[in-house]
């Protein structure tokens, strides 16, 4: 299955797990900048793009289980969504996570979905499987077409 429709904005840390998943999707996308250790907020904010058209956000989850939510949504994703234009153009979210963290598995998707009142389309573990890739393409295309973006 091929993605010919939707656009994804994604964040991937230096581990590149999310980036490797994105390469399998072979779709139009934009990667958010990686936060550098001890980087002042002003520097990170200056690197954050503005996206002037609809997109689906794909984000990893950084939470350690046991209900610990602090830092679940990566800082560059928060900064990106603090921009009203980006927030308005974010139409859905997909999240990755680690099932070892039980109750906080992919919680970044839940947090963003609730805060922005947008659909949480899909969740997958770490690098994702071939089935995850096919599912994201199918679900993303259906969502995009249904909403006429």
Swiss-Prot record:
GO terms for biological process: protein modification process. Transmembrane segments: none annotated. GO terms for molecular function: FMN binding. Gene3D superfamilies: 3.40.50.360. Probably involved in ribonucleotide reductase function. Belongs to the NrdI family. This is Protein NrdI. It comes from Malacoplasma penetrans (strain HF-2) (Mycoplasma penetrans). The lineage of its organism: Bacteria, Bacillati, Mycoplasmatota, Mycoplasmoidales, Mycoplasmoidaceae. The gene is nrdI.
